[in-house]
Amino acid sequence: MTAEQRQNLQAFRDYIKKILDPTYILSYMSSWLEDEEVQYIQAEKNNKGPMEAASLFLQYLLKLQSEGWFQAFLDALYHAGYCGLCEAIESWDFQKIEKLEEHRLLLRRLEPEFKATVDPNDILSELSECLINQECEEIRQIRDTKGRMAGAEKMAECLIRSDKENWPKVLQLALEKDNSKFSELWIVDKGFKRAESKADEDDGAEASSIQIFIQEEPECQNLSQNPGPPSEASSNNLHSPLKPRNYQLELALPAKKGKNTIICAPTGCGKTFVSLLICEHHLKKFPCGQKGKVVFFANQIPVYEQQATVFSRYFERLGYNIASISGATSDSVSVQHIIEDNDIIILTPQILVNNLNNGAIPSLSVFTLMIFDECHNTSKNHPYNQIMFRYLDHKLGESRDPLPQVVGLTASVGVGDAKTAEEAMQHICKLCAALDASVIATVRDNVAELEQVVYKPQKISRKVASRTSNTFKCIISQLMKETEKLAKDVSEELGKLFQIQNREFGTQKYEQWIVGVHKACSVFQMADKEEESRVCKALFLYTSHLRKYNDALIISEDAQMTDALNYLKAFFHDVREAAFDETERELTRRFEEKLEELEKVSRDPSNENPKLRDLYLVLQEEYHLKPETKTILFVKTRALVDALKKWIEENPALSFLKPGILTGRGRTNRATGMTLPAQKCVLEAFRASGDNNILIATSVADEGIDIAECNLVILYEYVGNVIKMIQTRGRGRARDSKCFLLTSSADVIEKEKANMIKEKIMNESILRLQTWDEMKFGKTVHRIQVNEKLLRDSQHKPQPVPDKENKKLLCGKCKNFACYTADIRVVETSHYTVLGDAFKERFVCKPHPKPKIYDNFEKKAKIFCAKQNCSHDWGIFVRYKTFEIPVIKIESFVVEDIVSGVQNRHSKWKDFHFERIQFDPAEMSV
């Protein structure tokens, strides 16, 4: 089992616990577990139920070290009948299981009616396909020995734990076939909302047991004047009107009056609830026969998912239609029809930009209200700004069509590069101009109430020591110097690139420089094409190795030397597994010559990282003072997330923290991001009182994601601008919370101090702008808008015309010919394949390490350059519908003009302007 599989099993354990009854698979796992462990699991189920038993089973499972146990676990699930769970774990995709949650909630709520009206014997034969065989036997036995209601209760419990995605529909058909009264309540076809509303009619005044969350941050569930724990607040009757706080009404007031507004209020105060108030008021103000249409923009996918849930639960009960669209769903639905058919639409902004550009949405006039979450992003070429460019062109042009009201939400408007209040005011006015805002709403009249809800953490900056001597860095730096010299000697002309001074190893600056050199080498051309191939391939290898060495130095600076060394060992292992030519053998030999010394240095206790020692002291002290402390630890990179998680787990004094990790979904050159279900699972575990006590996160956690209340925030070599500072600090929401900045750099501390000064300037500037009369503020904003439009128009670039000339694609590593652009076809908008058997002879396939099915594609293999000793990664081989085709990535190739011979690199397909021909199945049969 790989470390990643173990980590994923940890991340998804909450899904597994909800479904798995481990006693059903113990017979298959008996050779992997001790007899005593099997007995403990059985006892845990008998005493506390299957969920606690599953938790204990996973605990034992994750302790196993022998090879093969993970596959044995999957086989056990499959043979026991847990096919859905087995499939989810194999692909690490729990979306099908997650979609069942609303049906589980409904069945829990309707369980009294289910027990009162259903005889399990009448429908068990129909439902057997959705249940484990052993569950069917237990239901029959309980029905026969304890009666109908006890049997129905057991059946409901088993259905709620079922991993079969069709169980809600099968239950409906079984109930209808039996003419059961319960079928009137269980209406799957017409949706969860209809079924719930029918249940509400039958329940009368009975309080609902379904919990709803309608806020940006968990503590804002307590919208009354009596702050309490979330569990208390969430038990309110579903239909009781939620009482806003006075400061929330103050924030909502300008927007309720119809003004374009930027709402600037601290993280944790419930800005999402404010947006719900505004949205509800807006939709209700239209006279009979007219309707409003609201669009809510969320910038990040986890935030989008969160807000889609919040808006749905709040507004569906008021009779409004709500829909949500993201990049993951936009290809399979008509965005135009979704917008036409719904009152409220939750969107990621790029979806609207794309549909405005292709004409599917004619203009922004289809909406009556636009709400921008994290609106401080409305700048430069961000999708928010692209939407507002359309808005402002419409406003400043001759069109008479009505424009929607605009509302922006943010914890900080920022000050840009401003050093004075005047410059800050100019920056804020620019943001107001971008959003066409006439008001900045802040809490002024109800500050005392706000301070009772949002606690500003105590900020502590600690300058920590760096290593006084660093033998590890010296050894790696020497290897880098030797590699640079080898690269320099390959080509006299390109060797000049390596003569540039002031490139410090182990820095982001060096990373940027080596990436630039890497690109320059890849398009280097010579008259002798064989020699060009040799030179480019050698330089590709040298620059790749330099980049990995630089990565390792960056890791060792903030983590343990062993983490950096393991990173390099994994890299050289991959090198040996791929094409292993003379150059790579030489580079590997040099590394292995130093490996024993590197191992010795990294294991030496005297080389412990002082930063980690200081982090240890902070955690020890805070958890000693307050054992129930919940911590978010912010770090810069995913590699550091993994390293610190390992460090905490291996430290006996800290392992009780049970660290969780939260990273972004995007892919970097070093790692694949977390899937959305994995992110949600981690957040749920962190919110649970007994699970993770510390969450190690990258920047994905500092903006907008709904993270539970915590009382300790640690910024580990982590600093940004004033907006980032306010957002990360805002994650410490409990009373008496603290925010530590730990860094070895005096510059970082100075930057943080500068951010604190800028925050004061920002607040001061907002207050001054709020004293301006409406006319003065409006004129200032209008002047900026006119000037910005003139600048935009003067810089307007015509759309690039696709180049219809045929071009060559060459391997980005060895420069071997791959294909012509004339043979490339576009599959479903964003995938690119190559036609013809000739191309298939130029690559080799290897099994994909993570085969997966998504939409119409099934990943089957990875494809690599077939030239001897190259094996450059070209993309993947997939099954698309009934076809098996290669899918290539443009960053793996160099594009050569056939006529001029000029070569270029493109990191994204959108930057490569060639004539795109759509995939036609008819061509595959030619």
From Swiss-Prot:
GO cellular component: actin cytoskeleton; bicellular tight junction; cytosol; ribonucleoprotein complex; ruffle membrane
Post-translational modification: Phosphorylated in resting cells and dephosphorylated in RNA virus-infected cells. Phosphorylation at Thr-771 results in inhibition of its activity while dephosphorylation at these sites results in its activation. ISGylated. Conjugated to ubiquitin-like protein ISG15 upon IFN-beta stimulation. ISGylation negatively regulates its function in antiviral signaling response.
Residue window of motif DECH box: 373-376
Residue ranges crossing the lipid bilayer per the database entry: none
Catalyzed reactions: ATP + H2O = ADP + phosphate + H(+)
Domain Helicase C-terminal stretches: 611-777
The Helicase ATP-binding domain, residue ranges: 252-431
Gene Ontology molecular-function annotations: ATP binding; ATP hydrolysis activity; double-stranded DNA binding; double-stranded RNA binding; GTP binding; identical protein binding; pattern recognition receptor activity; RNA helicase activity
Function comment: Innate immune receptor that senses cytoplasmic viral nucleic acids and activates a downstream signaling cascade leading to the production of type I interferons and pro-inflammatory cytokines. Forms a ribonucleoprotein complex with viral RNAs on which it homooligomerizes to form filaments. The homooligomerization allows the recruitment of RNF135 an E3 ubiquitin-protein ligase that activates and amplifies the RIG-I-mediated antiviral signaling in an RNA length-dependent manner through ubiquitination-dependent and -independent mechanisms.
Name of the protein in question: Antiviral innate immune response receptor RIG-I
Species assigned in the record: Mus musculus (Mouse)
Lineage, opening ranks: Eukaryota, Metazoa, Chordata, Craniata, Vertebrata
